[in-house]
Amino acid sequence: MDLETKMKKMGLGHEQGFGAPCLKCKENCEGFELHFWRKICRNCKCGQEEHDVLLSTEEDRKVGRLFEDTKYTTLIAKLKSDGIPMYKRNVMILTNPVAAKKNVSINTVTYEWAPPVQNQALARQYMQMLPKEKQPVAGSEGAQYRKKQLAKQLPAHDQDPSKCHELSPKEVKEMEQFVKKYKSEALGVGDVKLPSEMNAQGDKVHNPAGDRNTPAAVGSKDKSAEAKKTQYSCYCCKNTMREGDPAIYAERAGYDKLWHPACFICSTCGELLVDMIYFWKNGKLYCGRHYCDSEKPRCAGCDELIFSNEYTQAENQNWHLKHFCCFDCDNILAGKIYVMVRDKPVCKPCYVKNHAVVCQGCHNAIDPEVQRVTYNNFSWHASTECFLCSCCSKCLIGQKFMPVEGMVFCSVECKKMMS
């Protein structure tokens, strides 16, 4: 690929969603404009998933690439035009007749994703067992939740080197090997079935009355109906599964384990595993992001996994050497004074300009290294020139004082004089 083609491809990536409004910042954001390497909006600093960007096709390409060269190729289809694998997302449309005064109207509900099972009644049951605010009904809060989780749990830059910022050939090779490894050893998709169906097939199921690793005996005809109802328990919450309710199985975990639909969550972030896509490691379920975090350091600047042997650690976070930069101006911070603002490093000039509190005495910004006095939302330089009685100008450092909004007084008398 020549340089011109590469630049065109990069430009198109940065044009995607350009100008889309931020759902979080509203009118405070001028519209989405992707930062060159941070994966956030340059205007409001929110992620692309917080903006009203139509990403369904792009997300389907991302998940399609994830399933490529795995046993889940039945969930993808390759476009004839470019051969790019596309996720065959299962969309479920339910129609319910609604009685009206004169005739019967049809109420249609579209789920942007549903479990790919032949039994639609089972898929409907699955959806009803999810919290309402997480059901991916088109145009709803749940659909927006799914969109955010697709972006958060399965970042494209965790599997596609072309989505990363200036990787070396060695880093590209290491990343490709890493992706190949997690596809073969950890990646999976949950399967929705009735526990009784698995029992009838002779599969092992988890028995809450025994050890977690001890499968329940199946096919015993002398069990009472009550015993059958308490035969299955959720691997996550340990509560009993109700008879007739669907359960989720994860093949990599073994079919002796099952989960309630609302309990099929990442063990790190606690969020529903989007589209039941999971990663299994050491007896735990992970989303894609947190599985990768358990294997590789992640740069707090660009959000990419670090495949270089050389990187820096600061403020309990990892950073590419080139990405340990001021969050406001992008200047490299190595060897410079910086201040953490909402867990982001900011250089001293930007801190003073954009974030520093203003002294109530001199009305100038307070430098980060300078001592200050703070009361409620008001601050002063801790100096004899600034922290003074608002009436008589007596220095109040180390003294008792009476605060009144942005003023301080040394005595009741001074306060009365200014009333």
Curated annotation (Swiss-Prot):
CDD domains: LIM1_Testin, LIM2_Testin, LIM3_Testin, PET_testin. Its main location: cytoplasm. Keywords: Cell junction, Cytoplasm, LIM domain, Metal-binding, Repeat, Zinc. One of its GO terms (cellular component) is focal adhesion. InterPro entries: LIM1_Testin (IPR034958), LIM2_Testin (IPR034959), LIM3_Testin (IPR034960), PET_domain (IPR010442), PET_testin (IPR033724), Pk/Esn/Tes (IPR047120), Znf_LIM (IPR001781). It is found in: Cytoplasm; Cell junction, Focal adhesion. Residues 92-199 form the PET domain. Pfam families: LIM (PF00412), PET (PF06297). It comes from the Eukaryota. Residues 232-295, 297-357, 360-419 form the LIM zinc-binding domain. GO terms for molecular function: zinc ion binding. Residues 133-164, 199-222 are annotated as: Disordered. The keyword Metal-binding applies. GO terms for biological process: negative regulation of cell population proliferation. Residues 155-164 have a biased composition (Basic and acidic residues). Belongs to the prickle / espinas / testin family. The N-terminal and the C-terminal halves of the protein can associate with each other, thereby hindering interactions with ZYX. Scaffold protein that may play a role in cell adhesion, cell spreading and in the reorganization of the actin cytoskeleton. Plays a role in the regulation of cell proliferation. May act as a tumor suppressor. This is Testin.
